């Protein structure tokens, strides 16, 4: 489940605790999942959100994973995206963000990452460790201060985003290079491309005029949006019953979203260096 405000403008609205509870109730868990280690010290993520608000961060989007095991429900991984109230958007195109990940089901500790939100497509991107490394914080009971410090550490590195976007924009890809990038991107969702409902080159199709172009930044954004939003299909492909394949579904799960976002950025970095 996901909740976000209408970010068609460059001013993201802060979401309330009521909205957070409605879409990511694991943020408000009052205890860890039974059976956690005795070294685990519980602290509700909601308290971290409150502390972030006091430091000038506003939560603008939240989501949680869909656990396979019912025992993990209510404790599963969740994500909150924050923007600074005093942060100025980069030329009205994107706003830098700090992303908080956590769970209370023994699967992970706190993770603080850099991200950005593009206004034109209303998509959130996540920055890979190769540019701005994530900061990990264990559940010790003293993590509020460590997480606040980590958020400002990430904030201090956010200017790298504008520089990297400029670098991506300066690189023009040939048709063959763009197609190879698309094939690698499709593999993030489908290990066997023959089982995908689309051809890799379909991921290169822009959804709006602003995303047209052959530069690395434009192509990265087209691939990211098409992989996550789905809705595309290869009308020439048939399923096992000889019928046309169904359109590619949108990504709803948090784990898959993380895999695609981080993986795609890493591929883009490799393309940039080559």
Report each predicted region and the residues it spans.
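A generic structural signal for short, non-catalytic loop/turn and secondary-structure boundary residues
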Residues: 35, 73-75, 93
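Short amphipathic alpha-helical segments
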Residues: 40-48, 143-150
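Acidic, serine/threonine- and proline-rich intrinsically disordered low-complexity regions
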Residues: 47, 53-56, 83-90
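Short, well-structured alpha-helical interface segments that form or flank functional binding sites
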Residues: 43-50, 54, 75-79, 95
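A short acidic/basic microdomain associated with nuclease active sites
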Residues: 56-83
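Intrinsically disordered, low-complexity regulatory segments
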Residues: 1-43, 50, 54, 268, ...
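Intrinsically disordered, low-complexity regions enriched in serine/threonine
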Residues: 1-6, 86-94, 100-274
């Amino acid at each position: 489940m996901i909740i976000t405000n209408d970010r068609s403008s460059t001013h993201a609205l802060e979401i309330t605790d009521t909205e957070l509870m409605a879409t990511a109730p694991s943020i408000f868990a009052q205890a860890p999942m039974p059976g956690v280690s005795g070294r685990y010290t519980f602290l509700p993520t909601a308290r971290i959100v409150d502390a972030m608000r006091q430091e000038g961060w506003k939560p603008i989007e939240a989501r949680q994973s869909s656990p396979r095991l019912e025992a993990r429900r209510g404790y599963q991984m969740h994500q909150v995206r924050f923007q600074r109230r005093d942060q100025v958007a980069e030329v009205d195109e994107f706003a830098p963000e700090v992303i908080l990940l956590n769970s209370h089901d023994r699967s992970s500790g706190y993770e603080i990452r850099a991200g950005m939100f593009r206004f034109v497509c209303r998509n959130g991107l996540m920055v890979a460790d190769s540019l701005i490394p994530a900061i990990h914080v264990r559940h010790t009971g003293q993590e509020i201060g460590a997480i606040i410090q980590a958020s400002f550490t990430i904030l201090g590195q956010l200017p790298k985003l504008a520089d990297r976007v400029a670098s991506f924009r300066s690189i023009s890809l040939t048709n063959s290079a763009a197609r190879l990038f698309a094939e690698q991107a499709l593999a993030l969702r489908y290990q066997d491309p023959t089982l995908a409902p689309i051809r890799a080159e379909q991921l290169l199709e822009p959804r709006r005029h602003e995303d047209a172009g052959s530069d690395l930044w434009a192509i990265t954004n087209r691939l990211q949006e098409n992989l996550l939003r789905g809705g595309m299909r290869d009308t020439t492909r048939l399923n096992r019953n000889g019928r046309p394949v169904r359109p590619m579904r949108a990504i709803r799960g948090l784990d898959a979203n993380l895999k695609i976002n981080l993986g795609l950025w890493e591929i883009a970095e490799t393309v940039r260096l080559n």
